[in-house]
Amino acid sequence: LLIGANSTIAQALQENSEREFLTFSRSEGTLNLDGDLSELDDVSDIDGLVYFPGTINLKPFTMLKEDDFLNDFKINVLGASKVVKKVINKLKEADGASVVFISSVAANIGLPFHASIGASKSALEGMARALASEYTNAKVCFNVVAPSLTETNLSTNLLKTDRLVEASKERNPMKEIGDPKKIAKTIDFLLDAHNNWMTGQVVRVDGGMNNLK
């Protein structure tokens, strides 16, 4: 089950994986999880979930309003929570299931102008670890993929000129922008039933940005 399936990384996953996916995405505005997910009641088998919706709300701290924090938290954390609650019984019925959340390098290292997204993604990672612990006996794995800046539809404004692209590359230890296909391959790995002894982990696919100078 892919939530936010029109995202760049989700599309890369669908194009490069042999798995069969059930997809949900938004065309305009916000995905209505209450209404849109009702049709899952008729789906018999779900053995994986990837939650893609996210935000890139970069502002100086003094410019952030309470609604900025609440909106980021609603999309990144409450949305993921709502989907998991909807399908957790179906995941428990599977012979080993995997849930993957998408975080950000900003959840673990301090980046300017990332206060609201860093807070919400940190909360998402914390929720993933708690759920991993809660559902170990049910054999439902919860993991997180945390990329650095990746070339996606969300990051278009951050990479709209050659100068911005080069500046972003320079900030990365490997001097690269993230490739959606590489992020998708990591997600595909975590969805594989053969890797179901891995849970509660944050996989940082970030060109070394989290640990290297």
Protein language model regions, located:
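Canonical Rossmann dinucleotide-binding motif of NAD(H)/NADP(H)-dependent dehydrogenases/reductases
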Residues: L1-F21
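Active-site loop-to-helix junction immediately N-terminal to the catalytic Tyr of the SDR YXXXK motif
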Residues: L64, G110-G118, A130
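Short, small/polar-rich loop/turn modules that mediate ligand/substrate recognition or access, typified
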Residues: T136, C141, M198-G200
